[in-house]
Amino acid sequence: MNTIEMNRATANSDFEFSYNMIFAGEPGTGKSTIAKIVAESLFEIGAIPQNKFTTATSDEFVKGYVGQTGENTRKILDAALGGVLFIDEAYELSTNSGQNSFNSEVLSVLIRYMEEHRSDLVVIAAGYSKEMKDFLASNVGLTRRFQWIQFEDYTTQELTDIFEAMRSSYGDTYQNPALADIIYPLFDKLVNTNLSHPDVNGRVTNGGNGGLVRNVYQQIVQARNNRFVAGNGDKSFTQNDIVTGFKTEINKALQRAQ
């Protein structure tokens, strides 16, 4: 945002900067959350006229037949004018994907709007890094109209910190404070298991970043609830609750290789 603010402060008032961005990275790295923050910041510094955030997925643009797709795309873009349009899984609009003629029409309209509405529309297109590179390469007009922002996978320490923040927000406690020390090594084992077992599409991931933490937490809570309902102990997390939760997610990764 510092670059954007500098551009606004030093630019000739007749020059319109383009703030369209590619958010590239794996799921769970906070792309949609950061996009909302960017929209608010752009409004606050006067880069867009409204504090407005509109979302759309690639399949919402394509409709019926080729001519209808263009009309539908214009409706989506018109509704987003004044603010930020966030397109998730934008790589599905690549002309290299299955619906070449439809996607070509979508991109043609999108590029024209980005050019003609520099002062009242910012497009943030998000998706996997490799696929987003293919998306940009599918149309010569895309590359020069987007800034590339890479979202890295969370480290094991960051996953642990997110878990602890989640636990604190829900008011859950450990049966023994020392149990906090086993969270990091368990996440490390889980991440390494995921990295060594590609998903059904052959993609190697750490398991979903923020989504991985939510899954682990839910499994631990489920193990705790089952134990508590059975009359065994209180609601604080036990070592067995924690290990059971992580083991469930580790087994999911192992099953992908079968």
List the predicted regions and their residue ranges.
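Pre-Walker A adenine-sensing motif
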Residues: 2-14
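Substrate-engagement module of ASCE P-loop NTPases
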Residues: 77-79, 106-121, 170
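Short glycine-rich substrate-engagement loop in P-loop NTPases that contacts/grips substrate
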Residues: 49-80
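A short helix-turn-beta junction within AAA+ P-loop NTPase domains corresponding to the substrate/partner-engaging
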Residues: 136-153
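Conserved AAA+ ATPase small/helical "lid" subdomain
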Residues: 150, 155, 163-236
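Flexible beta-alpha connector loops of hexameric P-loop NTPases
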Residues: 58-68, 92-104, 148-150
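Walker A/P-loop
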Residues: 13-51, 75-79
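C-terminal engagement/docking regions of AAA+ P-loop ATPases
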Residues: 223-258
